[in-house]
From Swiss-Prot:
The active site is at 324 (proton donor), 353, 457. The gene is pgi. The keyword Cytoplasm applies. GO terms for molecular function: carbohydrate derivative binding; glucose-6-phosphate isomerase activity; monosaccharide binding. This is Glucose-6-phosphate isomerase. Keywords: Cytoplasm, Gluconeogenesis, Glycolysis, Isomerase.
């Protein structure tokens, strides 16, 4: 295409939403009118699937669950009064609780106010709040947020030691988020945090808040120990779509972020993505572009390039939303399909000095998504040269990279928002949630369960049970024992490698296990309990 033809294609496929001042440009994706026509029946079904989902149909058949994250920003859509109350009442409670914390009505025993917030969670209970905090938290928030989002002891120590070093532990509110209350990572982070608080002479319940399912293990703990408050999670909201539930709204509000604006932005985008006309539905346009890029089989990766520091974590947030939703072995008919779209990214223009070299000249196994923010900063900008600011450079880098990629037959999408505010962030969340839903329908997969994650949890649990058996066996041995003999004694003769990795980890952490012999030849090692 020549420049005039490209300009016409840009206008033909441009989507603009006046209320959000939002643009979506898919013109640099090379799909044809014939493909659009061929996909019309699939999109008709996708639109109908969304109608049924929002009315309360069982959209997650593998777990026999409704999927209701769209109701969170418009409770009137919920299928019954009970579910509406499950949305409106927690939101009211969150706003009241946050106001009391900010005003000092709810405060720690030895400080006038809470100054910091420690959020403990994993997956969507961390990635969403982290993205929103990076994007929207004010420079001087009423509560500065910190995260424990892993079972890494050193990572936990770094967070807690930092709070202790600044004498902030005594004024830190701890919010633990876990749907079941039994997920190991938040459970472990909670236990470690509680131990540190108690070691400092701080009664943990005076600092603790839970976000969990009513009746869960975490809910019971919060009730038994008389924590400050527990906010509910709903069965019909998955972790990766929970940012606009208590999971994300509570930490955001505590930081002083306008959560009502986030909800309103999402609601407005939801309305736009209900339109049953492909060209007038931004989420459907995204799904079309994804389908074209990977031939409906995820053959190309999605590279997210936000040209704004505040959106640095958007790619990590989308990584879970897209990959956990769409990465499925089987479709809804039971056929093996191995679906999914790999997602990665960082930020522009940093990435132009990193992997964009490969994007332009290397393996063409991707499509790019540029996130453009029109407003540069609050206040005037310095002219670095006549008529040119640093924001002009950033915009030029985006446009130049888009053009350079296109010249080498690399496809790209451009999403444009006016500024990084609560309304736009809420709209972005809603846009990609709906695009994932549409794409899941196009390729006929259940986008709302995660059997692979559950398989990993079960495997980890079996390894920990094996570790217990190894420790018990070693403690009852009178002397050193060979690795293969140990594996046989714990009834795991086919798992010698796993047994080896368990004892190596125990030995490295002074857990009473010693390894004797040449580490280059693990099969020759002798294992012994050091009493």
């Amino acid at each position: 295409m020549n420049n005039q033809q490209l300009w016409q294609r840009y206008q033909d496929w441009l989507y603009y939403h006046g209320g959000l001042d939002f643009y979506l440009d898919v013109s640099r994706m090379g799909f044809s009118d014939a493909l659009v026509e061929d996909l019309q029946p699939k999109f008709a079904k996708a639109f109908q699937d969304m109608v049924a989902l929002e009315k309360g149909a069982i959209a997650n058949p593998d777990e026999q669950r409704m999927v209701g994250h769209y109701w969170l920003r418009n409770p009137a859509l919920a299928p019954n009064d009970g579910i509406r109350a499950e949305i409106t009442e927690p939101l009211r409670q969150i706003k009241a609780f946050v106001a009391d914390v900010h005003q000092g009505n709810i405060k720690p025993p030895t400080a006038p106010k809470f100054t910091d917030l420690l959020a403990i969670g994993i997956g969507g209970s961390a990635l969403g709040p982290q993205f929103v905090a990076q994007a929207l938290a004010p420079n001087f928030p009423p509560l500065a947020i910190h995260f424990i989002d892993n079972s890494d002891p050193d990572g936990i120590d770094r967070v807690l030691n930092c709070l202790k070093a600044q004498d902030k532990l005594k004024s830190t509110l701890v919010v633990t988020t876990s749907k079941s209350g039994g997920t190991p990572e938040p459970r472990n982070g909670l236990a470690e945090t509680k131990a540190v608080f108690e070691a400092q002479g701080l009664h943990f319940a005076d600092y603790a808040v839970a976000v969990t399912m009513p009746g869960s293990k975490l809910s019971q703990q919060a009730q038994t120990e008389q924590w400050l408050q527990a906010f509910p999670m709903q069965d019909w909201v998955g972790g990766r779509t929970s940012e606009l539930s208590a999971v994300g709204l509570l930490p955001a509000a505590l930081q002083g972020i306008d959560i009502q604006a986030m909800l309103d932005g999402a609601k407005t985008m939801d309305e736009a993505t209900r339109v049953r006309e492909l060209r007038q539905n931004p989420a459907a346009l995204l799904a079309l572009a994804w389908y074209y890029a990977g031939d409906g089989q995820g053959k190309k990766d999605m590279v997210i390039l936000p040209y704004k520091d505040r959106l640095l974590l958007f790619s990590r947030y989308l990584q879970q939303l897209v990959m956990e939703s769409l990465g499925k072995e089987r479709d809804l008919d039971g056929n093996v399909v191995h679906q999914g779209i790999a997602v990665y990214g960082n930020k522009g223009s940093t990435d132009q000095h990193a992997y964009v070299q490969q994007l332009r000249d290397g393996v063409p196994n991707f499509f790019a998504t540029f996130i453009e923010v029109l407003h540069d900063r609050q206040g005037p900008s310095l002219e670095l040269e006549p008529g040119v600011t640093s924001g002009d450079y950033l915009s030029g880098f985006l446009q130049g990279t888009r053009q350079a990629l296109f010249e080498n037959q690399r496809d790209s999408i451009t999403v444009t928002i006016p500024e990084v505010d609560a309304t736009s962030v809420g709209a972005l969340i809603a846009l990609y949630e709906r695009a994932v839903s549409f794409y899941g329908s196009l390729v006929n997969v259940n986008a709302y369960h995660q059997p692979g994650v559950e398989a990993g949890k079960k495997a980890a649990a079996s390894i920990l049970e094996l570790q217990k058996a190894i420790l018990s066996t070693l403690q009852n041995e009178s002397g050193p024992i060979a690795l293969e003999a140990l594996a046989t004694k714990v009834q795991a003769p086919e798992q010698v490698e796993t047994v080896y990795k368990i004892v190596r980890h125990l030995a490295a952490n002074d857990r009473g296990v010693t390894l004797q012999g040449d580490r280059q030849f693990p099969q020759r090692l002798q294992i012994q309990w050091r009493s």
